[in-house]
């Protein structure tokens, strides 16, 4: 079994704020840790990060033991970001 990884780079103002909001909210549901420039998230078999990678750039990453687990992490991060930042209408495209 190999890890699969994807990444989404989102243009959004105050990316550190959105990373922190994801960390604060998801910390009640899954394992969350503060990392350099953002937050990491762990669900059984999947790992993700929300990082402020530029002045107006938030990078989300998702890794999973399987494609299904990676997609689960993508879904969780994307769903919550789109909910929190709805007024900013961020475009999330995973690669």
Task: Report each predicted region and the residues it spans.
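Amphipathic alpha-helical segments
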Residues: 15-27
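Structural motif
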Residues: 35, 53-54
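Charged, terminal alpha-helix-loop-beta segments
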Residues: 4, 51-52, 79
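Ser/Thr-rich, low-complexity intrinsically disordered terminal regions
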Residues: 28-48
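C-terminal structural segments of small proteins and small subunits
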Residues: 57, 61-95
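Terminal, regulation- and interaction-focused segments at domain boundaries
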Residues: 1-18
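Structural preference for solvent-exposed beta-strand-turn elements
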Residues: 6, 36-39, 91-95
């Amino acid at each position: 079994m190999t890890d699969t990884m994807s990444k989404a780079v989102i243009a959004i103002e105050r990316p550190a704020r959105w990373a922190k909001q994801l960390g604060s909210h998801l910390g009640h549901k899954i394992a969350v840790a503060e990392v350099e420039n953002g937050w990491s998230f762990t669900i059984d078999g999947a790992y993700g990060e929300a990082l402020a990678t530029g002045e107006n750039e938030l990078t989300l990453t998702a890794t999973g033991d399987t494609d299904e687990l990676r997609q689960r992490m993508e879904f969780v991060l994307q769903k919550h970001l789109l909910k929190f930042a709805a007024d900013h209408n961020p475009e999330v495209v995973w690669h």
